[in-house]
């Protein structure tokens, strides 16, 4: 193929920033002009010399914007001309390993990768979604695109997956680091069923909004509130810009029939404890096994939070963690313990409402002796009188001092000062006389609860009476100066642990230690002599002075033991420390829940952790492949009647697919398989807003809507025509066999931020400009980017110095022109040059919905919202997007308040030299400054006092 003829004069179509970006990111060192880069690439992807020459003409005239992989093709030895891949993680060992390997390979070849996640939640065969996503998060940094920039991975999960709440928040900078994946992008596949439920709730009334979360493997169902889930999605989008939204049923509904007939579907645009573990809930403490499948409220260290308990596995290896307060927990090696590194960190906890959520988490298998667990508050449970036992004080006393006769009847022998407690005891019968040793023998009611039963979940009154009885029987008061505590000893460790749980339900922490091991002791033999006896190990339960004070605040008192409640000056409780971790060899079923706020729950009295635009079908045998490029609508009037333009672009993309199929390494066979069977391309656009501004048409107008529909109607018609032409010349792929088509799918509106800069700062994709002037940083320095059409207007009306001063004003106002005087810009022109954040986003949705019917794949639609948007409006926009038939939503861009509303008046005044601006304009700008000052004043009156000056979307105080 002979060389392409280039036209160096076309370098003038680039601005300085576009040239810098091309040279820094795309051009080879020996290339001195962008024309050489265009010619080289067009030669690689052209069918013959004439086709290549025409492609060069299109690109050099800025009619056609080549995708990054095509534009950089040849610069990296291993790069391939494919922009996007969609993969699917099959829930098998092979699927997990193979997909990870393939995705890393695809990233290194220069493409962005979307990954559908079909992994089950945590069980004995899977550690759940988030642990795998952590691996992908690390790989996105390790395996760079073309060895230059970090990989771009977007993970997609169905909104009925049990791990959806953790998945939604994985890009939040705070919270459990084990679920943070800040280097990944993420999207949610949202079903029609869910949106229909949200729409139903939208009408108000008492609607049952129960939403089933279904494990993709076990099909086990848990539930959440649909409204709560929807609110979490929208709030997270406001805070982080993500997750992307894919209305999955809309995507599948609009697949071509020939794809549906093949059964293809679109799937994307372990912290567990043993069954007997006691969980602190709002209703009491219960074995986690008994709570399986139930929605309950658990204590997370600060408050009660709704969760669903699930069985996470069978025959899982368990470790036993022993702690200094006598508590033990049998859990999986990965179960998270919440650790405090230092006393300094512990002090910060007192003033940090998010201390638990933000604290360090350590796997059980990685715990070391003397590691300190975080302190936490305990609630006082009022309990349930249905669980009360009869004669609570008497039963408590019986547990300490009572025995059974040989006939199995409960009895007490009172001695010393305990005889004075007779009036408090429920006695069935008694001797009336003391025996030879001075004891008073009594027999208790036959319906007394069994000895060592502890009424953990009874009413608070019942628990206090029972505890008073037990401590009066076996307890002792220890005094250290004015500091008093109560200790009680017993040979039955499990019994003391149940008392420890009872105290937890009363808001009190306690400690159990071993008083002594089993030993031989010489004791009186009852016959006047002594002899050796075998003594069992003895354990001691310790209630501190702060614990006693807390009990006294609830009305607790003992009859025999005398102590004075003293309010502690500070939380002097010692930190609970790790003693050791035992590998017991135990294998058992496991259970857990996902607590959404602190990611924590109280287990056996211990607070620990708990457990877009390319829409193509994927499965275990295929990774979808799409080759992209965009048509520049800014030059639409130049190319719309060129009969070869669309055909040449489609032929070029087909050639790029062939290059991929022939040169792809065998390690990405699923992607090659998909490319062969589908041959899907994605023709998109950029420059839509520039096209409107060029014609002085407002984005928010019926005229813009008419042009939008007209453009995409004609594009769809031409693309369909040339799809059949190329099909007749080159044949149809397997999936489209019998249709005459060359490509299964042909259109996708992708984001084009970088391409827009290269194309002379045209507007990106189909979205509005974010600002009419802004600074852009590159490797070569900082550049002031100005709207070209606005610049032309200003140059016709002002001199150079005045223009510079007006640009300063625009920059100071966040790129807006709305504050400029009407004798400089008319009201119509101000409408035309509205920025993305000033445009009513209903128009963004309308234009997207109008063109969606002509686009067989999807669009990357960004929303631009003020941070103080009412949550009702936020909800309505997203609901309307679904109802309007949009397939996907991309980023939600939220303008910073500091830039949007609170503009510094002094900075504005210093930016403008009034002496050199025409008097009429000068006076008008002064007025606009006063308006901004008033705006600032009004804003300050509305500042939320609860968020340190930040307005919080969704905050009732702010609304």
Swiss-Prot record:
Its EC number is 1.17.4.1. PROSITE patterns: INTEIN_ENDONUCLEASE, INTEIN_N_TER. The record marks 955, 958 as: Interacts with thioredoxin/glutaredoxin. InterPro entries: Hint_dom_C, Hint_dom_N, Hint_dom_sf, Homing_endonucl, INTEIN, Intein_endonuc_central, Intein_N, LAGLIDADG_dom. The keyword Protein transport does not apply. It comes from the Viruses. The active site is at 270 (proton acceptor), 611 (cysteine radical intermediate), 613 (proton acceptor). GO terms for biological process: deoxyribonucleotide biosynthetic process; intein-mediated protein splicing. It catalyses: a 2'-deoxyribonucleoside 5'-diphosphate + [thioredoxin]-disulfide + H2O = a ribonucleoside 5'-diphosphate + [thioredoxin]-dithiol. The record marks 890-891 as: Important for electron transfer. Under complex allosteric control mediated by deoxynucleoside triphosphates and ATP binding. The type of nucleotide bound at the specificity site determines substrate preference. It seems probable that ATP makes the enzyme reduce CDP and UDP, dGTP favors ADP reduction and dTTP favors GDP reduction. GO terms for molecular function: ATP binding; endonuclease activity; ribonucleoside-diphosphate reductase activity, thioredoxin disulfide as acceptor. The record marks 84, 626 as: Important for hydrogen atom transfer. The record marks 91, 120 as: Allosteric effector binding. Substrate binds at residues 68, 83-84, 112, 751-755. Keywords: Autocatalytic cleavage, Deoxyribonucleotide synthesis, Disulfide bond, Oxidoreductase, Protein splicing. Disulfide bonds join 84-626. Pfam families: LAGLIDADG_3 (PF14528), Ribonuc_red_lgC (PF02867), Ribonuc_red_lgN (PF00317). Residues 378-508 form the DOD-type homing endonuclease domain. It is an enzyme of class 1 (oxidoreductase). SUPFAM superfamilies: Hedgehog/intein (Hint) domain, Homing endonucleases, PFL-like glycyl radical enzymes, R1 subunit of ribonucleotide reductase, N-terminal domain. Belongs to the ribonucleoside diphosphate reductase large chain family. Heterotetramer composed of a homodimer of the large subunit (R1) and a homodimer of the small subunit (R2). Larger multisubunit protein complex are also active, composed of (R1)n(R2)n. Ribonucleoside-diphosphate reductase holoenzyme provides the precursors necessary for viral DNA synthesis. Allows virus growth in non-dividing cells. Catalyzes the biosynthesis of deoxyribonucleotides from the corresponding ribonucleotides. This is Ribonucleoside-diphosphate reductase large subunit.
């Amino acid at each position: 193929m002979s060389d392409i003829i280039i036209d160096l004069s076309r370098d003038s179509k680039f601005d300085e920033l576009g040239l810098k970006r091309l040279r820094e990111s795309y051009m080879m060192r020996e290339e001195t002009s962008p024309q050489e880069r265009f010619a080289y690439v067009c030669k690689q992807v052209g069918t013959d010399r004439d086709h290549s020459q025409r492609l060069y003409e299109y690109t050099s005239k800025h009619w056609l914007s080549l995708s990054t992989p095509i534009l950089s093709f040849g610069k990296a030895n291993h790069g391939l001309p494919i922009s996007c891949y969609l993969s699917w993680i099959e829930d098998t060992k092979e699927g997990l390993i193979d997909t990870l390997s393939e995705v890393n390979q695809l990233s290194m070849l220069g493409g962005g990768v979307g990954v559908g996640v079909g992994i089950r939640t945590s069980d004995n065969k899977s550690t759940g979604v988030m642990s795998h996503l952590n691996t992908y998060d690390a790989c996105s940094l390790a395996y760079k695109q073309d060895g230059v920039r970090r990989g771009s991975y977007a993970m997609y999960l169905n909104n009925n997956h049990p791990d959806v709440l953790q998945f939604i928040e994985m890009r939040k900078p705070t919270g459990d680091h084990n679920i943070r994946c800040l280097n990944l992008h993420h999207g949610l596949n949202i079903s029609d069923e869910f949106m229909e439920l949200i729409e139903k709730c939208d009408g108000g009334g008492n609607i049952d909004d129960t939403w089933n979360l279904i494990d993709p493997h076990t099909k086990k169902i848990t539930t959440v509130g649909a409204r709560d889930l929807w609110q979490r999605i929208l709030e997270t989008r406001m805070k982080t810009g993500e997750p992307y939204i894919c209305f999955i049923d809309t995507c599948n509904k609009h697949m071509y029939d020939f794809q549906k007939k093949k059964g293809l579907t679109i799937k994307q645009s372990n912290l567990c404890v043993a069954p007997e573990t006691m969980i602190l809930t709002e209703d009491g403490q219960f074995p986690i096994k008994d709570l399986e499948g139930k929605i309950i409220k658990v204590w997370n260290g600060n408050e009660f939070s709704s969760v669903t308990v699930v069985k996470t596995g069978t025959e899982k290896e368990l470790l036993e963690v022993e702690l200094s307060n006598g508590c033990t927990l049998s859990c999986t090696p990965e179960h998270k313990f919440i650790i405090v590194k230092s006393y300094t960190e512990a002090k910060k906890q007192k003033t940090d409402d998010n201390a638990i959520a933000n604290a360090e988490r350590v796997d059980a298998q990685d715990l070391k002796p003397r590691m300190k667990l975080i302190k936490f508050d305990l609630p006082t449970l009022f309990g349930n009188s249905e669980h009360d036992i009869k004669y609570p004080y008497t039963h408590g006393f019986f547990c300490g001092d009572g025995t059974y006769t040989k006939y199995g009847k409960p009895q007490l022998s009172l001695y010393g000062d305990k005889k004075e407690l007779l009036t408090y005891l429920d006695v069935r019968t008694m001797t009336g006389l003391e025996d030879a040793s001075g004891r008073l023998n009594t027999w208790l009611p036959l319906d007394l609860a069994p000895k060592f039963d502890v009424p953990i979940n009874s009413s608070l009154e019942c628990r206090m009476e029972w505890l008073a009885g037990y401590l009066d029987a076996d307890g002792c008061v220890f005094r250290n100066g004015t500091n008093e505590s109560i200790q009680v000893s017993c040979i039955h460790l499990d019994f003391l642990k149940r008392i420890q749980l009872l105290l937890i339900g009363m808001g009190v922490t306690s400690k159990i230690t071993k008083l002594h091991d089993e030993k031989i002791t010489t004791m009186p033999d009852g016959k006047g002599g002594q002899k050796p006896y075998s003594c069992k190990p003895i354990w001691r339960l310790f209630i501190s002075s702060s614990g006693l004070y807390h009990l006294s605040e609830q009305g607790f008192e003992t009859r025999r033991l005398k102590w004075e409640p003293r309010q502690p000056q500070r939380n002097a409780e010692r930190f609970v420390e790790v003693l050791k971790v035992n590998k017991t060899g135990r294998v058992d079923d496991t259970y857990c829940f996902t607590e959404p706020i602190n990611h924590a729950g109280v287990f056996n009295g211990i607070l620990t952790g708990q457990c877009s635009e390319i829409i193509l079908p994927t499965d275990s045998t295929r990774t979808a492949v799409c080759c992209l490029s965009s048509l520049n609508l800014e030059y639409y009037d130049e190319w719309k009647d060129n009969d070869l333009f669309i055909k040449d672009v489609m032929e070029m993309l087909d050639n790029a697919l062939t290059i991929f199929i022939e040169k792809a390494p065998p390690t990405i066979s699923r992607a090659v398989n998909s490319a062969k069977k589908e041959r899907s391309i994605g023709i998109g656009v950029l420059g839509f807003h520039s096209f409107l501004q060029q014609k002085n048409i407002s984005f928010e107008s019926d005229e813009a809507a008419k042009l939008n529909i007209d453009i995409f109607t004609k594009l769809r018609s031409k693309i369909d025509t040339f799809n059949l032409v190329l099909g007749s010349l080159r044949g149809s792929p397997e999936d489209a066999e019998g249709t005459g088509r060359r490509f299964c799918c042909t259109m996708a509106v992708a984001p084009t931020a970088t391409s827009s800069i290269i194309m002379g700062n045209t507007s990106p994709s189909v979205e509005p400009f974010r600002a009419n002037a802004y600074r852009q940083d590159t490797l070569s320095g900082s550049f002031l980017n100005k709207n070209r059409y606005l610049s032309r207007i200003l140059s016709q009306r002002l001199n150079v110095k005045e223009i510079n001063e007006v640009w300063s004003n625009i920059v100071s106002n966040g790129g807006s022109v709305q504050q400029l005087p009407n004798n400089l810009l008319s009201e119509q022109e101000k409408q035309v040059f509205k920025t993305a954040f000033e445009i009513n986003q209903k128009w963004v949705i309308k234009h997207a919905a109008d063109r969606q019917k002509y686009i067989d794949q999807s669009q990357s639609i960004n929303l631009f919202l003020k941070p103080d948007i009412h949550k009702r409006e936020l909800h309505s926009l997203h609901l309307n997007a679904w109802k309007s038939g949009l397939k996907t939503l991309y980023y939600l861009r939220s303008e910073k308040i500091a830039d949007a509303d609170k503009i510094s008046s002094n900075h504005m005044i210093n930016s403008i030299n009034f002496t050199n601006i025409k008097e009429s304009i000068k006076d008008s700008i002064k007025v606009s400054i006063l308006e901004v000052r008033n705006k600032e004043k009004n804003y300050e009156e509305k500042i939320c006092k609860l968020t340190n000056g930040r307005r919080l979307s969704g905050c009732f105080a702010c609304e």
